[in-house]
């Protein structure tokens, strides 16, 4: 199962500059002149047993003005953490380029408004997008203020994903937070105004029922955005609702249920949550809750029967968040804010008192969506599926954009071996050995000019599972190993060795990812031709291009016949299948 761990990281202007009008509002974005909590999170991943995942860090600045500086700060922190995992950063600029590709495939030009890094729900969608581009089977969502304390957390997180439990397939799995006291309860102090707004009390009840009791895995009405594991069938179909301002994680559970996906929680999958203390006043925090619950209730109330969807009720999400999605929500808001206003008045805080009373008015006016939230979400879901289709169609081009920010690429060391240039005559000699067809001298020369020399040192990775097959190569010297698995995940399974004269990647025209890994066992030299250059040749010189293409097909058939690859089973298919499909 291909795993992509995604950790969005939020950045703000320097502390001395402060928040400015138009900046996005997040709980605790890291000022540019501070380090924040990201390095702590990355360093906590070092003891993980298996690092056979790709790690992506979407960089979310509160304003485009600081995007470049934020990128440099994140890269500095990643370098310092020195986590031995394949790591990417994903920037606002990367998103813009990916959006342009989506835009080109979307003739109605409707999908790109979903592709933005402003707001929590939108950021979560970008996390899913990154996982999709990297061909993930499992998207593992983590936050940058968490600490891993279990070395087997990653393999635990996907243990049940895609499997059937109690009649349902597990498409969404939730872990849970523990606080600095190693408890799963919210670290808050009860106050009188909470009598009518007992959110933490109902959360505690839900946590006790789902987290605190057996069995290990059970259906859940809630999930945590920083400990959420999604199967590709779910994240390619169901987006986070861009209109939810807060609580996008639990809202995602509601949306998923509407589309027939059930979330489960694993009560052994804990992760320590150590957020920076919130500085917002209490009236503002309850206002954020008002907006989310009023919106979610409106979405539930506005449901209507439609094909392939499930009508959900507040009771489906009891005790939390269901208790705050009922008809008495308005009464809860009124009573709790009246008491909060009284508390502020006793403290002599007239502003806090006025804002608390204003919450009541907001709940009846501004918080009410001015549109049908159910129909709007259905529209966004359809647009999200179009984005997923665009990714499937243009994954190669999008992946190239992400690879530009792959921080784990082995730097190419330039020396005499690396810089050796082959003369056209040498390349033609190798091509004549590899391919059995008659060409004129001019055609051989034309073909040779499309090939480039590539070299790899001993133990250097040539490609990894999930990388795209974008070229065909002929080995001139050295030896390559094709294998499944990894050193971190309990061992490599050697499948075959390639030596001088062997051809690698002859199925590159199928435009699909590898499911195997390839590493150089000694210094290896190859000549290769890109799939784009093959296509250009077919278009510019059809006679030569078709001849060459036929030779590629011959090589595929020869590999099928002569190498007995059928006997090597791989994930329900065979290694032969992967060669045919362009994945090896």
Tell where the protein language model's regions lie, with residue ranges.
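Cyclic nucleotide-binding regulatory module and flanking cytosolic helices
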Residues: 414-458, 508
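Short beta-strand-to-loop element that shapes/binds the nucleotide-sugar donor at the catalytic cleft/hinge
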Residues: 168-192
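Short, acidic, metal-binding catalytic loop of nucleotide-sugar glycosyltransferases
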Residues: 21-53, 76-80
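A recurrent flexible, glycine/aromatic-enriched loop bordering the glycosyltransferase active site
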Residues: 209-229
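Terminal low-complexity segments of carbohydrate-biosynthetic enzymes
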Residues: 52, 288-417
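Active-site-proximal specificity loops/subdomain of glycosyltransferases
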Residues: 70-134
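Cyclic-nucleotide recognition modules
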Residues: 443, 493-550
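Acidic donor-binding loop at a coil-to-helix junction in glycosyltransferase catalytic cores
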Residues: 245-252
């Amino acid at each position: 199962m291909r795993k992509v761990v995604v950790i969005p990281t939020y950045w703000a202007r320097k502390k001395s500059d402060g928040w400015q009008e138009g900046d996005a509002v997040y709980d605790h974005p890291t000022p540019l002149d501070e380090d924040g909590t990201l390095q702590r999170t990355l360093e906590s991943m070092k003891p993980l047993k298996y690092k056979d995942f790709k790690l992506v860090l979407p960089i979310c600045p509160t304003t485009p003005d600081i995007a470049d500086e934020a990128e440099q700060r994140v890269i500095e922190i990643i370098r310092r953490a020195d986590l031995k995992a394949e790591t990417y950063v994903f920037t606002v600029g990367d998103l813009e380029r990916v959006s342009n590709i989506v835009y080109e495939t979307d003739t109605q030009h409707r999908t790109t408004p979903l592709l933005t890094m402003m707001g929590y729900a939108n950021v979560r969608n970008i996390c899913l997008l990154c996982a999709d581009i990297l061909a993930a089977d499992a998207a593992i969502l983590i936050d940058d203020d968490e600490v891993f304390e279990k070395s087997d957390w990653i393999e635990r997180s996907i243990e049940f994903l895609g499997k059937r439990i109690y009649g349902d397939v597990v498409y969404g799995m939730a872990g849970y937070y523990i606080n600095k006291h190693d408890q799963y309860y919210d670290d808050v102090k009860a106050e009188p105004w909470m009598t009518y707004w007992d959110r933490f009390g109902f959360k505690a009840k839900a946590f006790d029922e789902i987290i605190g009791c057996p069995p290990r895995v059970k259906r859940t009405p809630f999930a945590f955005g920083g400990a959420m594991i999604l199967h590709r069938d779910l994240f390619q179909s169901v987006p986070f609702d861009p209109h939810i301002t807060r609580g996008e994680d639990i809202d995602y559970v509601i949306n998923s249920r509407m589309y027939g996906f059930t979330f489960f929680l694993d009560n052994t999958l804990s992760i320590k949550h150590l957020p920076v203390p919130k500085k917002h006043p209490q009236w503002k925090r309850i206002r954020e809750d008002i907006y989310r619950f009023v919106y979610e209730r409106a979405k539930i109330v506005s449901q209507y029967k439609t094909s392939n969807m499930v009508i959900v009720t507040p009771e489906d999400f009891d005790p939390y968040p269901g208790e705050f999605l009922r008809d008495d929500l308005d009464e809860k808001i009124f009573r709790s804010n009246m008491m909060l206003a009284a508390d502020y008045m006793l403290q002599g805080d007239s502003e806090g008192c006025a804002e608390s009373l204003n919450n009541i008015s907001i709940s009846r006016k501004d918080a009410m969506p001015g549109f049908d939230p159910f129909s709007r979400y259905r529209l966004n879901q359809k647009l999200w599926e179009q984005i997923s289709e665009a990714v499937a169609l243009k994954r190669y081009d999008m992946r190239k954009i992400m690879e530009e920010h792959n921080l784990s690429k082995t730097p190419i060391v330039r020396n005499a071996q690396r810089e050796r240039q082959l003369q056209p005559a040498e390349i033609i000699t190798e091509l004549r050995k590899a391919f059995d067809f008659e060409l004129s001298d001019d055609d051989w020369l034309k073909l040779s000019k499309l090939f480039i020399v590539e070299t790899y040192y001993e133990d250097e990775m040539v490609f990894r599972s999930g990388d795209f097959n974008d070229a065909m190569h002929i080995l001139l010297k050295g030896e390559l190993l094709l294998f499944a698995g990894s050193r971190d995940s309990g061992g490599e399974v050697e499948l075959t060795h390639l030596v001088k004269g062997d051809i690698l990647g002859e199925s590159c025209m199928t435009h699909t990812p590898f499911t195997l890994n390839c590493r150089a066992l000694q210094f290896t030299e190859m000549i290769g031709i890109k799939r784009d250059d093959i296509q250009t040749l077919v278009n510019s010189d059809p006679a030569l291009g078709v001849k060459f293409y036929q030779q590629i097909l011959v090589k595929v058939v020869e590999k099928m016949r002569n190498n007995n690859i059928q006997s090597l089973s791989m994930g329900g298919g065979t290694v032969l299948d992967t060669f045919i499909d362009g994945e090896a």
